[in-house]
Every structure is written in structure tokens, then in C-alpha cells.
């Protein structure tokens, strides 16, 4: 559900006891962690048990599994996840009691107040860029607070309340949440139509980024990728308005750009040029050109904040990934199994490029779960086209999330658009059968990749178990 943003946004310390409805999610759990670290009393509930809930309990939060009206008792503020329905008993009870209701965006703004905020926005690459910047700053000796949409491997968490003045935050545009923040600096990775279930039109989606630009501190700056047409338009607009803006990219026109890019296996090495000055090399241990662009944005931001190139480069080289971003789940019988959150055509293409680099002479076997009916209706054909970069594709049923089914909008829109011979594409509604298809089609040296923003992430362990059961030495055609 959507909770309106209040006219007056209070700092976290003024919210009293805070109860989170949907505390186990990536967004709310991070905010809860930060509040707990600052001594704020926190409680919360979620539909099912999870490792996240157990971790929050260990930090001092009172966490419930299941939703009941009485669980908001004693709270002063109730933060509500967008995944929660309006008839949720805790939300209904909070409204009846007249408690302060906040959306996630307002709660994040509350913990960011008083800090120098760097907000990372964009259609794709937000989580990775936020993570890279955080690790790079840490290697410069800084201790920034951060809130990220996935667990940072180096920290083992998605959020941290640091001792420094900086707060690095992933700024989600999906429901307009990023228009609540007032950052000192902003990074925009790209701007490409998405979340049209909320925005209605591509023009409205792009206009939201223009409004986001206007929220940047006049003393601050924008970093954006000039290789991306949407982000390049934002750079032009910023300069027209007299705002400080830095372009990054692979193109010759980028102020901070990568040259002499070499990609071998899981590493990418490139030379950084900043307005004609050669600063040195960066080597990333995560594969794919899209990660190079994310690293350039993080690097350019760190440089503009006054940190030395050598330390930033060392931090970027140490970045080992974020959960669900080309995450290696395991290897059995010479077959590696990866998982990734990619669900938009451009994200799918980027991850398959990275997978091709990782696979080398091996083949790529993909299970893709389309995310949301509205996105599949609009982008289904483009998703299918992007999946053509794999060798074997299994398309699962749509993960409908918060939407209702729509007649005629099915995973077939994706499967029918995959430009591979029919014997290499399977439309499979059965979860267990999907795992079987992947194992049946993969052979030693191949790479299995599960893709999607839904519960397809849970498929990896099943695939590994099937591979384990088969044992080594299985001969396949």
C-alpha cells in the first residue's frame, strides 16, 4: 500500500518507538538496523520467518512472524512496506489509534537527516553502484552510513550507521520515493522506462528524474553516465540550470571515462582518464561492462568528494559483489550456478554479457522468471530478445507480486520472443520441473543462471542438490 509522506519530516530520534510492518524486506530491514544502532526502540512483523528477522532480533528488535493488530501496541510510529495490503490488521489498528504512519521513503529520510547524503538513482545498477561507492569510501578511511537494496558481501549487511558525516543511500524511483530525499550529491546510472504501472507513461517516469535533479543541494553535484541517452539528457539539463555535473562513461565525450578496457573471465581492468588526466588503472573482480560503468560513477563521486584516486581504486578492486547481483551459489560436477536480480531487458542483457565472460567456452543455461504482469505486458518481447544471448532458456510463470493476473499476459510473451531454435526454449510453469530442465540441459563447464526479481532466487539450492544427486561423470549429449 501507499502511505502518504507527511508534510513535516521528523528526524529518527523524534519518532519514538518505531514498528515496521514488513520488517523482513530489503528496504525496511536496513532502516531498522540503523535505528537500532542509534538506540531507537524497534519492533516489527513479517509474513514469514527469515534470517533477516533473526538478525534483527539479535540486534535488539522485537520481531513477530505474522500480522496481528495487537503487535502495534506501544508504538509511536508505524513504517509500512509498499508490499503490505491496506487491510493489514496492523495498519488498520495503527490508523484507528492515530499513530504516525510513514512510508519507507520517509523513514529513510528520517535516519539520513543531519548527514551529508549521496543518493544513487537510476533504472539499473543502483544497488551495485551504492555498494561500490560504500566500499571505496571505506578504503579511504571513511565510515559512511549506508542503506542498500541488497546485502553487501564485505559487510554482510544491507545497512550501517557510521561515525562519519556521509550517508550513501540507494534511492528507489519505483514509486517516486527518491523525491522525498534532499541529497548533497546524486549519482544517476541510467534512465530508461520502467515501473509504468506506477508512472503511467515513459514521459512521467523521466520527469521524475528531472524533479530528483532539482532536489540536489545547490552546493553539491550530479554524476551521471553520458553513454545512456536518458542520463545524458539529465546532464545537459543540469548544466543548463548552472548545476555542477560530471559525466562518466566509455565514450570519448565522458569527463571521467574508462580506456583500454580488458575483460578476462571474472575480472575487468581499465585505465581511468579524468578530463584528460590519466589517473591510473582499476581492476574489478566482478565481470561485465555494466559493472565498469557503475565503478566509474562511484569513482567520480569519490574524487569530487575529495578522496584520493589510489584509495578509491583499491576499494573498487576489493569489491566482491552484492547478494543477488551475479551471485555464485555453488558449483557441482563442473557446473557453476549463479543467481541475479535482473528483470528488465537491459539488466538481462548486461548479466548475460557477464555470464558469457565467466563461462568462457562453456554454455549458458538460464531460468528466467518474469517479474510483474504490467512489466511483462510492456517489455515481454524485449525480455525474450535479451534472453537470446543464452544457449538454453527456461521461462517460468510470471511472479505477479502485488498485481492481479491479466488475461492474455503470460510468460509466453517472453518465451515466444526468444530468438533461439524451439528445442532450446522451454516454457515451464512447474518449479520442480524447472530445476530438472536446467540440470538436464547443463553439462560440465556450463554456467546455470537464475534470473528475476521474484522467488526464482530460491531455485539455486534445488539445482545444486539435483547436481549433487547425479554425481560426477554424467555423460550428456
Tell me what each language-model feature is.
Residues 1-107, 229, 244, 254, ...:
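N-terminal leader/targeting and accessory segments in enzymes
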Residues 3-19, 27, 33-38, 184, ...:
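Nucleotide phosphate-binding/pyrophosphate-handling subdomain across enzymes
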Residues 18-20, 78, 118, 144, ...:
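Conserved hydrophobic helix-helix packing surfaces used for dimerization/oligomerization
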Residues 34-37, 57, 71, 82-226, ...:
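Phosphate-binding loop of NTP-binding sites
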Residues 40-47, 222-226, 365-369, 389-400:
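Short internal beta-strands
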Residues 72-77, 165, 443-446:
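Short acidic/histidine-rich motifs immediately flanking catalytic phosphotransfer sites
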Residues 384-444:
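C-terminal helical cap/extension that packs against the catalytic core
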Residues 434-466:
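A glycine-rich beta-strand to alpha-helix segment
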